[in-house]
């Protein structure tokens, strides 16, 4: 990837922060860090998703950098490249990385579904397996 900064979609509504990057001193990184000034980080067992930053970072991208929702590849102000979800997040033949969504930061026992999801995604090691996985997830390939 050759961009001043990059992020990808998690789903059609939200770019995500599991995988992102930027050159040194990029304003997008400063904007994300500024959000955390004066924030409390007490863990709430009853609302474990309360501090997940996907929505917050998406709002920064939409409001400050004119990102459009809808899982579309786009170039934003300050050279921020936004990739479709099949490049940096969800498994496909276009994947550079895969976000496994294991929820390791969640407290308590990991669920059976999360364990199965992790087991499957960790074995998507070649294009044949990605195509098979994508077929069953109803993702179309060219």
Describe each PLM feature range:
Residues 1-142:
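Glycosyltransferase-associated regions of secretory-pathway enzymes
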